[in-house]
Curated annotation (Swiss-Prot):
Reactions the enzyme catalyzes: feruloyl-polysaccharide + H2O = ferulate + polysaccharide
Protein name: Feruloyl esterase C
InterPro entries per the UniProt record, alphabetical: AB_hydrolase_fold, Tannase/feruloyl_esterase
Organism name: Talaromyces stipitatus (strain ATCC 10500 / CBS 375.48 / QM 6759 / NRRL 1006)
Binding site for Ca(2+): D260, D263, A265, D267, V269
Gene name as annotated: faeC
Keyword Cell membrane on entry: no
Entry's EC annotation: 3.1.1.73
Top enzyme class: hydrolase
């Protein structure tokens, strides 16, 4: 009997293997056939290829500044690479990844920085989850803004046209490749990708049923002014207003001493970011004190100024403060005595069309000149989202309280802008727009604390909708169950990192407070309060 059972199991295994091989061959043949069926205006197909799960794809055409030469594919899929003409002087590079384990869902990824790079990691992540996935390069190659010089069409691609065109083409290809087409459409992006998601929310309300937009770069023109204004404040490394990394470390330590406990727990995470308003006069050098262990009065002023909003020439508010507590990161990014590259490129190649423009001269009058231009409405700061709401679509946005690139304060400012414009209280906005503050999260991920929320591949520790923002959006759209919180995890380092602890991140306008009685690593010891 045992021998008979073993033979049956072996036979079944061989049959299943043959079935898998046959299914894979059929899928590969469908991929080959697709190459002959693509006839879309303005679309030039570079190649169509079947890629097996686990293949490490070489990205030979990816610009070096994008920092990615290869990507491991996480599903058997059909890869389509294209160029799409968007005007007589612009085009986008577009890819579509169609997985064999298709769930009937379409998804577009976004970009980062000044765009110019397809987010292949996000494409691998989404396609592994069964989404037909598209990604574009924002209308130019690489991270520099030099392509914008005297070419407003490329700026328009960056503003909205790259993502929207990718969606239009991608949906048509999805319907062509899969007989059933798609039943729901989603978006997943962060930073510039977050802004691109909100551009769809504000202007292309039928592109997506659900948008996940992280750390959004909306209020884009003022964001570039704000990012650029740190250099005139700190000066270069020889200026008497400049702080060394040792001195910024002192400032950051002082912030944590003053603010970490405001949420009830000393855990290296400032949850009570709205209540954090540090002072630094106590750091001024005393007679005989080592200069690396203290600050001059001018340096204290620098530390206060970088934590202040920016205003126009008439005192009008333009962009909020950098949230305190990120000095130990920003001392390498925007407080390092060098101009911030993205802001410099925006002003050189778009605002002033002058490659010789000096970023040290940036001032409030320049902010106003830039804002008045707002090419292709790249600001992405419309407050009336009623058309998106009425279309039945949903948007979930998240932002870290320790973001050193795009201050988390800007998502709070935008939420209030929408509430005031639409005359809508939080419970009304909750029907279609939910914002979560992620304690300790850096820019789009990482940082200190339970920051892994499934927004990117490296932060995927669970596919439970309570612990994965993408699947939370799927559940909201398809089952009508809206997320009340997002569970994040603190992950150990290295391959196969395990969960150290979890925390439920609160829906704005509530905030996380430690109430005990357990350890601060116990998610049940925290409560969301107003």
């Amino acid at each position: 009997m045992m021998l008979t059972s073993a033979i049956l199991l072996l036979t079944l295994g061989v049959q299943l293997s043959h079935a898998d091989d046959s299914s894979r061959e059929n899928f590969s043949n469908r991929c080959d056939q697709l190459a002959k069926e693509i006839h879309i205006p303005n679309v030039t197909v570079n190649f169509v290829e079947y890629v097996a799960n686990g293949t490490n794809v070489t990205l030979a055409d990816n610009p070096p500044s994008c920092g990615q030469s290869n990507q491991v594919v996480l599903a058997d899929l059909c890869r389509v690479a294209m160029e799409v003409t968007t005007s007589n002087q612009s085009q986008i590079t577009l890819e579509a990844w169609f997985p064999e384990n298709y769930t009937g869902r379409f998804l577009s990824t976004g970009n980062g920085g000044l765009a110019g790079c397809i987010q292949y990691v996000d494409m691998a992540y989404a396609s592994s989850m069964g989404f037909a996935t598209v990604g574009a390069n924002g209308g130019h190659n690489g991270t520099s803004g030099e392509s914008f010089y005297h070419n407003p069409d490329i700026v328009e691609d960056l503003s909205w046209r790259s993502v929207h065109t990718g969606v239009v083409v991608g949906k048509e290809l999805t319907k062509k490749f899969y007989h059933e087409g798609f039943h729901k459409s989603y978006y997943l992006g962060c930073s510039t990708g977050g802004r691109q998601g909100f551009k769809a929310v504000q202007e292309f309300v039928h592109d997506f049923d659900g948008v996940v937009a992280g750390c959004p770069a909306f209020n884009f023109v003022n964001l570039n002014s704000w990012s650029g204004h740190f250099y005139p404040i700190t000066g270069n490394s020889s200026a008497d207003t400049f702080l060394t990394t040792a001195q910024w470390t002192l400032v950051q330590q002082s912030v944590m001493e003053q603010c970490d406990s405001l949420d009830g727990a000393v855990d290296g995470v400032i949850e009570a970011i709205d209540q954090c308003h540090p002072v630094f006069e106590q750091l001024i050098c005393r007679p005989g004190q080592n200069a690396s262990e203290c600050l001059t009065g001018k340096q204290v002023n620098t530390a206060q100024l970088v934590l202040s909003p920016i205003y126009g020439t008439k005192g009008e508010f333009l962009y909020p403060r950098m949230q305190p507590g990120v000095e130990n990161v920003d001392m390498y990014i925007t407080y390092n005595g060098d101009p911030f590259a993205y802001s410099t490129d925006w002003y050189k190649y778009v605002v002033f069309s002058d490659p010789n423009w000096d970023p040290a001269t940036l001032n409030a009058q320049d902010y106003e000149i830039a804002l008045a231009q707002n090419p292709s409405n790249i600001q992405t700061f419309e407050g009336d989202l009623s058309a998106f709401r009425d279309a039945g679509a949903k948007v979930l946005t998240y932002h870290g309280t320790a973001d050193p690139i795009i201050t988390g304060e800007t998502s709070k400012v935008y939420y209030r802008h929408v509430a005031e414009t639409m005359n809508a209280a939080p419970e009304e906005l909750d029907e279609f727009y939910r914002y979560f503050r992620i304690g300790g999260m850096s820019h789009c991920g990482g940082g200190t604390g339970a920051t892994a929320i499934g927004n990117v591949l490296s932060a995927q520790w669970s596919n439970d909708p309570d612990a994965n923002v993408l699947m939370a959006m799927v559940r909201w759209v398809e089952e009508g169950v809206a997320p009340e919180y997002i569970r994040g995890a603190s992950l150990g380092s290295g391959p196969g990192a395990k969960v150290e602890y979890t925390r439920r991140h609160c829906k704005y306008p509530t905030r996380n407070v430690y109430v005990g009685p357990g350890n601060w690593t116990d998610e049940n010891a925290w409560k969301c309060i107003l």
